[in-house]
């Protein structure tokens, strides 16, 4: 049983999806941790990137599809920032408004169909398979890791943005990363669904907290690496749950439990440390 859980295929898939979804976690890291803004447009922006990438990829331009997805994400981030900085809308409400509007926009991009397929369409991953044939079956991970490396470098630079432009530029970068993640996922699984972004903000938050708890947050580079690690670990936990034949209908519950545990981890660690200190103090007192 353990051999099947820790099989190379499970680990590889978890790493591939972890790198793709890590872009969303990095976007949330920028908006939530650096800008201190609760951006709730993540779900809709992710689906927007997925839908735009699908439409452009269908025309035979998979790489242009990713750029188009990022451009769409920038537009989403700009609207969110405009509502906050120019119209005085609270960040949470701005995210909700944009997320609500994006549902109709996403449907329109998808031709008012709830699903799209790229089964017979060339994707960046099929191109990478030919270009990176020397990597064997690891070409998807190599491509996803390369994107993460570029995004991580951009994230470190973004942390020093002039405060005067922080909200607008930061949310535009955040939207671009989120939409890029959606575009990559669309080409990875060769499909798009109108509900693909549902719950994405909570999943990204879980990845962010897992990474910061296990890796730490002393330096910006360490925090970025922690986000990627947290995303991969989250995907591995989901893969293990599937290996235990957890019904697909129960995966939302599994995700909710993972998120709850991840969010409470700092408090749990603090409580354990406090109990250890109290126990040590009691032992010293009894020794005296």
Question: Residue spans of the language-model regions?
Answer:
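Transmembrane alpha-helical segments in multi-pass inner-membrane proteins
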Residues: 175-252
